[in-house]
Amino acid sequence: MASLMQVRDCVALNGRADARLVSHQLNMPEPMVKAMLERLTLMGKLEEVDVEECLVGSCKSCPEATACQTKVYQLRS
């Protein structure tokens, strides 16, 4: 089982990451990763990224863009 430090490092290495990506890279259950990401956010180590800022091109005007949003995290700046 990965530690909070490994989850934080995984986000750092990817720049931005969601629970699915971290879960896959660390071979952990996604609900566990979500809980760890939320914990790291509460500790001030990570921050949620406004996903709408990430949307570009045709995705920005897509009506389904908000339906497929997931929480994306990055290191707190």
Curated annotation (Swiss-Prot):
GO terms for molecular function: DNA binding; iron ion binding; iron-sulfur cluster binding. Gene3D superfamilies: Winged helix-like DNA-binding domain superfamily/Winged helix DNA-binding domain. It comes from the Bacteria. Iron-sulfur cluster binds at C54, C59, C62, C68. Pfam families: FeoC (PF09012). Disulfide bonds: none annotated. This is Probable [Fe-S]-dependent transcriptional repressor. The gene is feoC.
